[in-house]
Amino acid sequence: MADANSADALTVKSNVSPAFSIYYLLMVHDHMMYFGDKALVKRHLPAIDGILGFFDRNLSEQGLVGKSGGPIMRHRYWSFIDGAGVWDSGVPAATGKGSGSVTMESLLYLYGLQKAAELAEFAGRTDTAAEYRQRAGALSDAIRTYCFE
């Protein structure tokens, strides 16, 4: 079996990284900014709603993104942040300690909510845009409260 830090680790087992889904949302936003393609945005909004719903369902009591995964091959979801050699398969050591909340995942979710609000507004879904902005505000408050001294 492949080591979790080896080059072929990704091919050994199913690997789902919720954080990568935020990058998909950001690509749709980039497309909107460059091309103004409302039809494409409308086509992708249901998937974006689902992505943001996953993160919303995984908020901790503090309002941060709670532990939804960990290192690849040992958890259902892969909490990949960066390929730093000192981290176990791209996951910060802090993920396994305390609350398990990963500040970077909360920050990614916040950025995703902000950009999804712009997408929803662009597509004429003003109620959804307002909801995403409200969720972003609550998450931003939680990040300021719990992630910084």
Pin down the residues of each PLM region.
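Well-ordered alpha-helical segments within folded domains of soluble proteins
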Residues: P18-D30, V102-A117
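Membrane-interface coil-to-helix junctions
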Residues: N5-S6, S21
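Active-site acid/base region of carbohydrate-active enzymes
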Residues: M1-A4, Y34-L107, A120-E149
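Conserved, well-structured interaction surfaces
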Residues: V12-K13
